[in-house]
Amino acid sequence: MVHNKGGIHMWKRFVAIGDSFTEGIGDEVEGIALKSWVDHFVQLCVNDIEYANFAKRGLVTKEIRSQQLEKALTFNPDLVSLIAGANDVLKGRWNHYAYKEDMKCMIDTLSKTGADIMIANLPDFTVRLPFSTEKKQVLKEQLLEANEVILSLSREHQLHHIDFWNHQLVNDNTLWSKDFIHPNSKGYVKVAELIFSSLPVHDASK
């Protein structure tokens, strides 16, 4: 169930940047059409909201910064979603300092527009991936490093922070595709509901 306290979201222009998690690739299940969580999120909003999803599969954070940040600014959003870092880890290109620099640059730039920014830590992919214990441990440590950066920046800039790492959906295999990395069509619905219910709302009665 989505709890929105009877209010409506106040935003009018929403833009999402990121990788395949936000683009919305994965398996279609239970007759639920495969859509990005972004599409489901907008459908949950009571008010009319224009939106653009610039996320693209396979990109590391540096590429998201170089290819999508300017597009996001041009859209003139009042709400931005930034979820990045999974490919840095999964493609073996993890660099703590480069990741922090790229994320900080994007958040600093977006913050100057006055837009609200929502950011999410990365889920623990290692619970499903068929890797050795040693490789899983390395990946998990890198994911935790990324999440430390995300949480630190979230606190510093007072961002809307969504906690995927500790949410129960991570351990629900019915919500994930056969590649063990991407949500399936049902999973994207749940992701949208989690993000929607995590955001503050405007009380329409006031």
List each model region and its residues.
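Cell-envelope and extracellular/periplasmic
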Residues: 55-59, 84-85
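Short, Lys/Arg-enriched, disordered terminal segments
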Residues: 1-13, 105, 200-206
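Alpha-helical cap/lid subdomain in secreted, periplasmic
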Residues: 66-206
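Serine-esterase "nucleophile elbow" of acetyl-processing enzymes
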Residues: 3-57, 67-76
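Gly/Ser/Thr-rich beta-alpha loop segments that engage phosphate groups in nucleotides
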Residues: 20, 26, 60, 87, ...
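Short loop/turn segments at beta->alpha junctions
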Residues: 60-61, 95
